Amino acid sequence: DNSYKVSGGLHGVGVSVVNALSRKLELTIHRAGHIHQQEYKHGDPVYPLTVVGDTDTTGTTVRFWPSAETFSQTIFNVDILARRLRELSFLNAGVRIVLRDERIHAEHVFDYEGGLSEFVKYINQGKTHLNDIFHFTVQAENGIGVEVALQWNDTYQENVRCFTNNIPQKDGGTHLAGFRAALTRGLNSYMENENLLKKEKVAVSGDDAREGLTAIVSVKVPDPKFSSQTKEKLVSSEVKPAVEQAMNKSFSEYLLENPQAAKSIAGKIIDAARARDAARKAREMTRRKSALDIAGLPGKLADCQEKDPALSELYLVEGDSAGGSAKQGRNRKMQAILPLKGKILNVERARFDKMISSQEVGTLITALGCGIGREEYNPDKLRYHKIII
């Protein structure tokens, strides 16, 4: 009776759909000392459920063959299956899942005793971490189970993944809201108690707190409610206080018991707040220098005469010498030339403030004319519809 208390949905619907879309489906059930078997063809039973033997084990085997009448392609992508089965193994510590690809005689075994801790470790491999993984599991009084694992690394992106009853929510929901609220409150409380905010003269935001954070938030909810059939956002209101309360208590204790880790995390957050402020100032400066204002265009840009972006081309060339040759050989009517240094900043690995303060990147932003950042970026203002590197 307890098996489906925190299930992901109506399992019968899932197998019914698979059955209807398969030319053949075989069920083998080991239960109550007997082996039961049934076969279906395009969703219709070939024969009733039949006892075919005795057993001392339990479990169900489902085999299906996708219908070529329904699908134009029936090739399974093992990478997609492996990714999801690995995820399920992380979310259910100690559960061993074996994936065999009999087409090439390959076998993948997923077995993670550490659960979410190992999930965070897997995501953060190859990155420099700032703290040991923080991990807790709590069973709330209302039957909601909360499990969280997190770790900060030296990157600048937030990577928080949320799950309800093993189902991923790419749009988050009430569990994510509870987690974020508790995380920000716990860090602000720690930094205020240590007098870091006044000392460093910064105001930190939730975004600053989550820069470089990898976290997994997994909840087990008896009757979850989602915003849609695809379950991409959790809307159960009782989950937010459950996650927030559990996270508040456990995370505050972690910060007090691990002063060195807390200090490293706080240092990264303060750096993020400073960078955000510097980026805001740089954005304002870029906004004032409108790229559509000819006076604001980069000095090295040899612009074209054409004013219609759809007919204009921009050539990005390496260095002034190549720029000189390109300017001599271009069609002035529609071809613009912008010389740049050979090796500029790798913006994928750079923080926003460093990127925007780079002279070469700034020149590109101004020449292209569509701005930068979530609030400013507008591709409709692009000055050249063809850009040649």
From Swiss-Prot:
The record marks 343, 346 as: Interaction with DNA. One of its GO terms (cellular component) is cytoplasm. One of its GO terms (molecular function) is DNA binding. It is found in: Cytoplasm. Its main location: cytoplasm. It holds the Pfam family DNA_gyraseB. One of its GO terms (biological process) is DNA topological change. Keywords: ATP-binding, Cytoplasm, DNA-binding, Isomerase, Nucleotide-binding, Topoisomerase. It catalyses: ATP-dependent breakage, passage and rejoining of double-stranded DNA. It comes from the Bacteria. InterPro entries: HATPase_C_sf, Ribosomal_Su5_D2-typ_SF, Ribsml_uS5_D2-typ_fold_subgr, Topo_IIA, Topo_IIA-like_dom_sf, Topo_IIA_B, Topo_IIA_B_C, Topo_IIA_bsu_dom2. Residues 312-389 form the Toprim domain. Its EC number is 5.6.2.2. A type II topoisomerase that negatively supercoils closed circular double-stranded (ds) DNA in an ATP-dependent manner to modulate DNA topology and maintain chromosomes in an underwound state. Negative supercoiling favors strand separation, and DNA replication, transcription, recombination and repair, all of which involve strand separation. Also able to catalyze the interconversion of other topological isomers of dsDNA rings, including catenanes and knotted rings. Type II topoisomerases break and join 2 DNA strands simultaneously in an ATP-dependent manner. Few gyrases are as efficient as E.coli at forming negative supercoils. Not all organisms have 2 type II topoisomerases; in organisms with a single type II topoisomerase this enzyme also has to decatenate newly replicated chromosomes. Belongs to the type II topoisomerase GyrB family. Heterotetramer, composed of two GyrA and two GyrB chains. In the heterotetramer, GyrA contains the active site tyrosine that forms a transient covalent intermediate with DNA, while GyrB binds cofactors and catalyzes ATP hydrolysis. This is DNA gyrase subunit B.
